[in-house]
Curated annotation (Swiss-Prot):
It catalyses: cytidine(1402) in 16S rRNA + S-adenosyl-L-methionine = N(4)-methylcytidine(1402) in 16S rRNA + S-adenosyl-L-homocysteine + H(+). GO terms for biological process: rRNA base methylation. It comes from the Bacteria. GO terms for cellular component: cytoplasm. The gene is rsmH. This is Ribosomal RNA small subunit methyltransferase H. HAMAP family: 16SrRNA_methyltr_H. Pfam families: Methyltransf_5 (PF01795). S-adenosyl-L-methionine binds at residues 30-32, 50, 74, 96, 103.
């Protein structure tokens, strides 16, 4: 069963107004959405986005006229906000990044190094290239780069060498085959954590273009929310958290102009219109980690849009 991560903290930080408009940009199994809906009155609205067709199929099965499901990438959030006439009127947006419970546990999706299945790893398995296609065709430099950069894996050279040697003889088709190769390359060095953890994370991030998706969404979200609106992020690894932290910090500062440069007051106001108030990061409690081990690496960051006046 999917347990939404830091549910109480999300609800508190997104600060629900009962007749407000909210976006859950990562619907998943709908854990957070269900709770947000329960806090809205009949005038409230919840737009939910997910790139996974199964997740949105599930959202569509929920009969609630306040809920608007969108199958697509959250990098298109600006386009969706215009289409649904909520641009500048959203009181809160939630990004709960990473994979949902149903994606991880379904061995046919190929996300898990714990279960054998086809090496796919696409969140939207109707589009794009699968991990299998990529790993059997990419050059060694690209494989090394992905495992090093997106997995922060120090044995990236060993792993990519073993992969490229093996595929000269036979294609890598399954998660188990890939896990065995990674074990062969560096299993000896990993005593506590699974040797394939970082490489699987890296390949998944690459296949789904996850960091770029996040950066594109960040370009637009401040414009979409209303003054006093909140943006809440839950991330599960340092690459995403760094991007989020940088985004919040950069947008929390007022623009500073060179001394004595003649600038119109209207320009200063305009430049400072989309600013954020930054709150302290939150991590799951010991109690939560005990009953939901998957929450242990989660970091929640949130910010509020201020209006210059
Ligand atoms: C951790 S799960 C969300 C779980 C959800 N909060 C819940 O409580 O059930 C993340 C979801 O985000 C989706 N997702 C990840 N990146 C996305 C993107 N760029 N655009 C749209 N959906 C995305 C995944 O398909 C997955 O279903």
């Amino acid at each position: 069963m999917h347990i939404p991560v830091m549910l109480n903290e999300v609800i508190k930080s997104i600060k629900i107004i009962p007749n407000g408009t909210y976006i859950d940009a990562t619907f998943g199994c709908g854990g957070h959405s269900r709770c947000i809906l329960s806090k809205l009155n009949e005038k409230g609205k919840l737009i939910v986005i997910d790139r996974d067709p199964k997740s949105i199929e599930f959202a569509c099965s929920i009969k609630d006229r306040r809920l608007i499901p969108i199958h697509g990438n959250f990098s298109k959030i600006l386009k969706y906000s215009i289409k649904y006439k909520i641009f500048g009127k959203v009181q809160g947006i939630l990004f709960d990044l990473g994979l949902s419970f149903s994606q991880i546990k379904d061995s046919n999706r190929g996300f898990s190094f714990m279960h054998d299945g086809p090496l796919d790893m696409r969140m939207n398995n109707l589009h794009g290239i699968s991990a299998k296609e990529w790993i059997n065709n990419a050059n060694i430099k690209d494989i090394s780069f992905v495992i090093k950069e997106f997995g922060e894996e120090k044995f990236y050279k060993k792993i990519s060498n073993v992969i490229c040697k093996y595929r000269k003889i036979k294609n890598i088709n399954t998660t188990k085959e890939l896990v065995n190769l990674i074990n062969k390359a560096c299993g000896y060095f990993y005593k506590k954590k699974h040797p394939a953890r970082r490489s699987f994370q890296a390949i998944r991030i690459y296949i789904n273009n996850e960091l770029q998706e996040l950066k594109l969404a960040l370009n637009d979200i401040i414009k979409i929310i209303s003054p006093k609106g909140r943006i809440v992020f839950i991330s599960f690894h340092s690459l995403e958290d760094r991007i989020i932290k940088k985004f919040i910090i950069n947008n929390s500062r007022k623009k500073i102009y060179p001394y004595k440069l003649p600038i119109l007051e209207s320009k200063i106001k305009n430049d400072n219109i989309y600013k954020l108030k930054y709150f302290k990061k939150i991590q799951p409690s010991k109690k939560e980690i005990l009953y939901n081990k998957k929450s242990r690496s989660a970091i929640l960051r949130f910010a509020e849009k201020l209006k210059y006046d």
